[in-house]
Amino acid sequence: MPLEQRSQHCKPEEGLEARGEALGLVGAQAPATEEQQTASSSSTLVEVTLGEVPAADSPSPPHSPQGASSFSTTINYTLWRQSDEGSSNQEEEGPRMFPDLESEFQAAISRKMVELVHFLLLKYRAREPVTKAEMLESVLRNCQDFFPVIFSKASEYLQLVFGIEVVEVVPISHLYILVTCLGLSYDGLLGDNQVMPKTGLLIIVLAIIAIEGDCAPEEKIWEELSMLEVFEGREDSVFAHPRKLLMQDLVQENYLEYRQVPGSDPACYEFLWGPRALIETSYVKVLHHTLKIGGEPHISYPPLHERALREGEE
């Protein structure tokens, strides 16, 4: 199914699966060199795709250029896989008009969206505002007609994966700033080697705790995160060392509490909201945000609303 259709059909219970796909999406494509950007800018959207997107029967995904930085080695495989799945679905549904061209076009939209995500992440790290004109000039030249859908998808993925929101501050000139979602002041970019914002994972964990009822067993946290292919003992291309991030960094930053379950033998541990999280945001904000960008997989839709409404009344 094409990327746009996937988003349109996303249900609340598919939230973490959607995040998992997004995590694979935003880590597999190296940023283009100046020469590549110039060549891309002088071509139309479909023309760019014809030389870049593999055929439906291609045995392997495209590879990133050698020497790609760790900042952007996460995007090609998922795009290739989604394109391949789209081709398979088309075959099952029967012949359609120009299926190869349609697949290439959808892949081109996805590829441009990914380029824009990387561009906006660089702007966020530099703490610089960005205009629509700058996005068109730097990333989407000759793609003006497709700007609304590409920009919308890029904004959605920034929220979904990184917890970064694109906010329009001057509508007349289409000037935007990039800020962390929900008023959280942590993004995990304190060290020189920290290249990916970590706010998205923090929001996911806070949501899991809120849904579980003020505290969540450690195994429940890792069970949910495994749906994003984020595992306790495995280094992650976006979140680096997830175990250290949750059990040390976010605890030290007072966003999470990690404690032994009282009376447990053998010892079991659980996560709670830390004091900094309680000051900067709230259960209702986190739960509404979770519903807005895709929902939660295992807890049914109504209870999520009920909990948010209860807190709103309190």
From Swiss-Prot:
Tissues expressing the protein: Expressed in many tumors of several types, such as melanoma, head and neck squamous cell carcinoma, lung carcinoma and breast carcinoma, but not in normal tissues except for testes.
Modified residues (Phosphoserine): S64
A cellular component term, taken from the record's GO annotations: nucleus
Signal sequence, start to end: none
Superkingdom field: Eukaryota
Region (Disordered): 1-69
Biased composition (Basic and acidic residues): 1-20
Keyword Nucleotide-binding appears in the UniProt entry: no
GO biological process, one term: negative regulation of transcription by RNA polymerase II
Annotated compartments: Nucleus; Nucleus, PML body
Chief subcellular location: nucleus
GO MF annotations in UniProt: DNA-binding transcription factor binding; histone deacetylase binding; ubiquitin protein ligase binding
Compositional bias per record (Low complexity), positions renumbered to this chain: 21-44
Keywords from the named record: Nucleus, Phosphoprotein, Transcription, Transcription regulation, Tumor antigen, Ubl conjugation pathway
Quaternary structure note: Interacts with TRIM28 and UBE2H. Interacts with HDAC3. Interacts with PML (isoform PML-1, isoform PML-2, isoform PML-3, isoform PML-4 and isoform PML-5).
Cited function: Reduces p53/TP53 transactivation function through recruitment of HDAC3 to p53/TP53 transcription sites. Also represses p73/TP73 activity. Proposed to enhance ubiquitin ligase activity of RING-type zinc finger-containing E3 ubiquitin-protein ligases. In vitro enhances ubiquitin ligase activity of TRIM28 and stimulates p53/TP53 ubiquitination by TRIM28 potentially in presence of Ubl-conjugating enzyme UBE2H. Proposed to act through recruitment and/or stabilization of the Ubl-conjugating enzyme (E2) at the E3:substrate complex.
Protein name: Melanoma-associated antigen 2
UniProt source species: Homo sapiens
Name of the coding gene: MAGEA2
